[in-house]
């Protein structure tokens, strides 16, 4: 019997519908024929906080305990979101069932999706054959095609390793640097691998804007029988006036040294990735990045858009069968 683990309830339901057959609903999972389908709640399992390491005195905020580094004995914990502990027990119980002989990773098709599945497997401590269901659309045909072409989970080990490295780097920098700055400056600070450099870039840009001193410049624009020839910016007014006198002199003539005509093909614009869409929604409609992602996630779960958290600008061959809108 296969146990298919999706990242969230709505995706699990879509997969169960695509599998087809008689469906029995249970608390935290559904059974469809000989398949079990369950789901996480995002990051159901995460790295433990320093104060949760009982064999270390890391609960006390002190410079004497820094740096904190659990390597190689990293510990995991179930997330604190509402219902996380209950759903974890459901998933863990299903994974340990004797009639479950295969685990299917159906979490989101990206690095974090891979991390969510691997962390659950690690924390539960089971060792069973694992396959990867890689699908970016919740259309039933797309899910069925993905089920028929699953690969061994070991082929995604590099993706899993990158997720683990990212998580541990964030933990080490965040836990150590946040405590260090807070203790040194006697105030609560949060320092992050991504957050802090990003804030620094924003502050630097804000300072550049605040310290900007506008400087005048001059340009000479000459009308040319229906179009205009514009010169470069000039820092000195006298230079612009001298150029203007030359252009207006009776013996001055414009000459065309080279004219070229060629046929050019402009390809249609590429599809959006998440960042590009968030930029345009902010610029055109004033939407925050979070609101844009929430709207796109809702469209994805309604089978009206492909997986939103991607940097890819292309679709699969399945898009050829998508009806035109």
Model-assigned labels for residue ranges:
Residues 1-167, 171:
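Intrinsically disordered, low-complexity regulatory segments
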Residues 310-312:
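Short, Lys/Arg-rich nucleic-acid/phosphate-binding segment
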Residues 302-308:
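A short, conserved structural fragment
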Residues 314-319:
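Conserved small/polar residues in nucleotide/adenosyl-binding loops
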Residues 34-36, 44-82, 93, 189-301:
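Long, highly charged, low-complexity internal segments
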